[in-house]
């Protein structure tokens, strides 16, 4: 879908965010779009499966780096988001939002509030969900 690259482009222009990626979780579990040469560009299928199947996951690997789960409502139809923090310094907020076909990963800079990252990621996911993807 061409809209994925547009979302990543939109996020990369914003100075509040460090990294972003969109990953298919229904079929291939591959990265569909990402900011090049960043952590989320290295996400592999083995890291996606535990996120969507294990509701009690505490320290998932994302892009070969550990993260700490803050809230997990990823598979909930009303919330469809998971909040995490990086497990390494400097600590940055991460939000994963679920559309019908993909996961949107968004990492804020250490100075960006969790609320800003959450709101932005959820807004993009809600917009994509409205189109049916």
From Swiss-Prot:
> Where on the tree of life does the source sit, at the highest rank?
Viruses
Provide the GO biological process annotations. Answer: actin-dependent intracellular transport of virus towards nucleus; symbiont entry into host cell
Tell me the compartments it is located in.
Host cytoplasm
What GO molecular-function term can you cite, just one?
actin binding
Identify the keywords attached in UniProt to this record, alphabetized.
Answer: Actin-binding, Actin-dependent inwards viral transport, Cytoplasmic inwards viral transport, Host cytoplasm, Host-virus interaction, Virus entry into host cell
Where mainly located? host cell
* Matching InterPro entries: PFN, PFN_euk, PFN_sf, Profilin_CS
A cellular component term (GO) from this record?
Answer: host cell cytoplasm
Known partners and oligomeric status: Interacts with host TPM1. Interacts with protein A25.
Its job:
Participates in either intracellular transport of viral proteins or intercellular spread of the virus. Cellular profilins modulate actin filament dynamics (polymerization and depolymerization) via direct binding to actin through an actin-binding domain as well as by modulation of other actin-binding proteins. In contrast to cellular homologs, the poxvirus profilins seem to bind actin only weakly.
The family this protein is said to belong to: Belongs to the profilin family.
**Name of this chain's protein:** Profilin
